[in-house]
């Protein structure tokens, strides 16, 4: 891959490989994609949500990931979402998820993100395929790295994608200067610790609140869906870390709050619950999900609202 040694190209390459400082210990919200009742993307709500996270203290947002319901949107719609976000960054570091099962659309979406000023990419492996060989996955990601010059993290979420990011795959791609790291949403502390130990020069971001402690102990970042409902609680963890405060206590507060939400609507989709609590936090109209997810029932809304009010009461 040809690398631009001057200007923005050099800056991006450097950003992908920074080591040995606190630059990597950043907090991104794995942002929801707001829709109206008819299922249409709501640009105004997206801008308001971005400002909310900025004011809460987030370093950035990841758009069109799992919590953002990316498979529910067409390529054209995903470009609309990305363009809306990238035109309204306001100091947030913005990472776009361009992943699809086919490399042509993935590269197309990645090019679009690059052209509109994305700071990076988070790419899920080509899903649905039954145990694709390591050679095929290496070829898929190599084509992406050959086409786009943006810091790019690979998305390890095997419970959902059914295609894990392996150590062998990362080693095969390690020579690409724009390989930034991974997002590990597996929730497996042993596996995540191995990623961190094996690739200390990359940003091995935790996508699970269970592993934020491991991330920060090793100077790594986190990309958190819980940041939708609890943006400030997530930001408080990283503020405490940077200020040498009690960041472990801040993690415990986040875990307790999220457990209360999980218990209140165990049968609701994660995205629907996060959208509902975010709407309550912001005092805005309900933020809807897209099919195949379904909207919350009245009983689920009532239960979530009661849990939310109990959480808020403990903060006073």
Residue ranges and their predicted role:
Residues 158-258, 262-266:
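Catalytic alpha/beta core domains of metabolic enzymes, predominantly
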Residues 80, 84-88, 112, 116, ...:
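Alpha-helical structural signal in soluble globular domains
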Residues 43, 47-50, 167, 301-308:
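Short, amphipathic alpha-helical "lid/cap" segments that border enzyme active or binding sites
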Residues 4, 17-162:
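Active-site beta->alpha loop and helix N-cap motifs at the rims of alpha/beta catalytic domains
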Residues 73-76, 107-108, 133-136, 165-167, ...:
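Short secondary-structure transition/capping segments
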Residues 2, 15, 26-33, 56-58, ...:
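C-terminal alpha-helical cap/extension of soluble enzyme domains
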Residues 46, 78, 82, 106, ...:
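A general structural signal for well-ordered alpha-helical segments in protein cores
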């Amino acid at each position: 891959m040809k690398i631009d040694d001057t200007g923005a190209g050099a800056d991006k390459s450097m950003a992908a490989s920074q080591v040995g400082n606190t630059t990597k210990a950043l907090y991104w919200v794995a942002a929801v994609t707001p829709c109206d009742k008819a299922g249409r993307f709501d640009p105004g709500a997206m801008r308001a949500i971005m400002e909310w996270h900025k004011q809460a203290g987030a370093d950035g947002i990841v758009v069109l990931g799992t919590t953002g319901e990316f498979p529910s949107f067409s390529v054209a719609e995903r470009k609309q979402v990305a363009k809306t976000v990238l035109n309204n960054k306001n100091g947030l570091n913005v990472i776009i998820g361009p992943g699809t099962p086919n490399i042509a659309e993935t590269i197309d979406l990645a090019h679009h993100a690059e052209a509109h000023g994305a700071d990076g990419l988070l790419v899920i492996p080509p899903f649905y395929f039954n145990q694709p060989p390591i050679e095929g996955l290496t070829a898929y990601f190599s084509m992406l790295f050959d086409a786009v010059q943006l810091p790019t993290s690979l998305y390890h979420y095997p419970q959902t994608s059914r295609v894990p990011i392996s150590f062998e795959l990362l080693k095969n791609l390690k020579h690409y200067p724009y390989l930034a790291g991974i997002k590990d949403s597996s929730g497996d502390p042993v596996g995540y610790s191995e990623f961190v130990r094996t690739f200390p020069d990359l940003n091995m971001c935790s996508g699970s609140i269970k592993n934020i402690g491991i991330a920060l102990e090793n100077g790594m970042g986190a990309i958190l869906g819980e940041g939708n409902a609890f943006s400030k609680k997530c930001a408080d963890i990283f503020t405490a870390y940077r200020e040498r405060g009690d960041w472990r206590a801040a993690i415990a507060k986040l875990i307790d709050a999220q457990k209360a939400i999980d218990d209140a609507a165990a049968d609701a989709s994660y995205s629907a619950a996060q959208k509902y609590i975010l709407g309550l936090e912001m005092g805005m109209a309900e933020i809807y999900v897209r099919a195949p997810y379904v909207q919350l029932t009245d009983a689920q809304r009532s239960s979530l609202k009661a849990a939310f009010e109990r959480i808020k009461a403990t903060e006073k």
